[in-house]
Regions:
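Sensory/regulatory domains in signal-transduction proteins
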Residues: 2-9, 15-38, 42-179
Length: 179
């Protein structure tokens, strides 16, 4: 994985991420496993699932932790169409309607790192799924006062929008406490 400095973003509850996120081959969190299986089922024999195939009622319990982003300028940036309420609580800000390139400015109030790192981190993960045309799984460590207290388990996957080319990404983050 390319080394990316900084953090995904932080808020009142998630002050700082201390280490680089780790790309993982397979998801470990039960909810990420469930979402990945759902998307794989929707994909069928196609390269990627289509946005129209998603039935929110089938994944209702996952929605608070989900994000849907629409590609802008061929994937140079992404506009957030859904930013779940659990993500708002975790990261300390509402991001629905914003571009990923706008995350940095807003996250600067919550992060001691260069705010541009926030933008680059989100773009890196989203573009990796979008241009790679397959799901990306990762783990993100969170720490406060130099102590690891939580791990974010994440998924980002491409979606088509009626065609065969990716047009959006769908993802989720679920946090688990570290004992």
């Amino acid at each position: 994985m390319d080394r990316m400095a900084g953090s995904f973003g932080s808020g009142e509850r998630a002050r700082k991420i201390t280490d680089e996120p780790q790309l993982v081959e397979r998801p470990e969190h039960p909810a990420i496993i469930e979402l990945a299986a759902y998307l794989e089922r929707l994909r069928g024999d196609r390269e990627m699932p289509d946005r129209a195939d998603i039935q929110p009622s089938e994944i209702a319990r996952l929605l608070p932790n989900m994000i849907i982003a629409e590609a802008v300028n061929g994937g140079a940036d992404f506009r957030i169409r859904l930013f779940g309420t659990a993500l708002v609580t975790l990261l300390g800000e509402e991001r629905t309607g914003k571009l990923l390139s706008e995350f940095a400015e807003e996250s600067s109030a919550f992060s001691s790192e260069n705010p541009e790192f926030v933008q680059r981190r989100w773009l890196f993960v989203t573009q990796r799924a979008f241009f790679g045309r397959k799901p990306v799984f990762l783990k993100v460590p969170f720490a406060a006062s130099g102590r690891l207290y939580m791990v974010g388990h994440c998924l980002s996957a491409p979606l088509t929008a009626g065609g065969s080319e990716p047009a959006q990404t769908i993802g989720a983050m679920f946090a688990s406490r570290v004992d």
